[in-house]
Amino acid sequence: MNIRGAPDLGQPSDDPNSGGERERIRQRMKMVIGQLEGILRELKEVAKELREVVSQIDKLTSDFDFELEPDDWTTATVSSTSSSDKAGVGGPFDLGHLDFMTADILSDSWEFCSFLDVSTPSDSVDGPEAPRPGTGPDYQLMNGGLPIPNGPRVETPDSSSEEAFSAGPAKGQVPQRTPGTRERVRFSDKVLYHALCCDDEEGDGEEGEEEEEGDLAPELPRVEPHTGPLKPSPAPYKTKRSPLTTRRLGPTLAPEQTRRVTRNSSTQTVSDKSTQTVLPYTATKQKAKGKN
């Protein structure tokens, strides 16, 4: 096919346009080859200049004596040597000409190894290291993170028990107890206490109400002496009030123990309230039956 798209019937192509394109392609190829030859000439000139610079550096540094100190030799410098340096008489492991295994070169490494030998005990010769006298185990109590050595101590209360409010162990306390058993019972008592009382902050108000109810309790039997058998006698109030009043008035108790007594007696105060609230309701009901 010719350029115009007509089929070629075997006639020789005498079109002048095809010859012109070939000439243009040849000229472009010659121009590219000329540019490449120019680039090669420039690279050769740059190489010559670099050689001259290196020779000048050698001349300038010929007066200096570069001697490496023994401490500067490391394993990295030995491993980074070329294959031509390694190919010696003794093979790649021949380091005699470097003097690498001398004591001066390995002074720092030997000192470091001796430091490790001193700091680290040997298992075969020294044996197990003896514990230092006067020191306990390194672990600490989980109760507040106090730096106290852990152990079977009686005066160490659990965080969930009410014994944490007291200053020390009571006189009648058991010397040895299993940790966890008594504290669980105390925790259940505290849950019952929270179920009966609204808040712990109302302890002062409950104490005031307890004193007022203690004064009003003996007057209830005088007003209504004909109540039924559900009415309690004044004796239980005296028995419940007497230890509390004696404990509060006792000068020998510590403030922490007083706080513990008030917290333990708060549940009794709630039970007294419940029994006292039932009494007037029962009395009015019986009066209504009497009127009918």
Swiss-Prot record:
Q: What is this protein called?
A: Inhibitory synaptic factor 1
Q: Which gene encodes it?
A: Insyn1
Matching Pfam families: DUF4589
Region Disordered, residue ranges: 1-25, 120-292
Give the residues annotated as coiled coil: 30-63
- Give the record's subunit note: Interacts with GPHN.
Q: Which species?
A: Mus musculus
Function comment: Component of the protein machinery at the inhibitory synapses, probably acting as a scaffold. Inhibitory synapses dampen neuronal activity through postsynaptic hyperpolarization. This synaptic inhibition is fundamental for the functioning of the central nervous system, shaping and orchestrating the flow of information through neuronal networks to generate a precise neural code.
InterPro entries listed in its UniProt record: Largen/INSYN1 (IPR027997)
What family name appears in the similarity comment?
Belongs to the INSYN1 family.
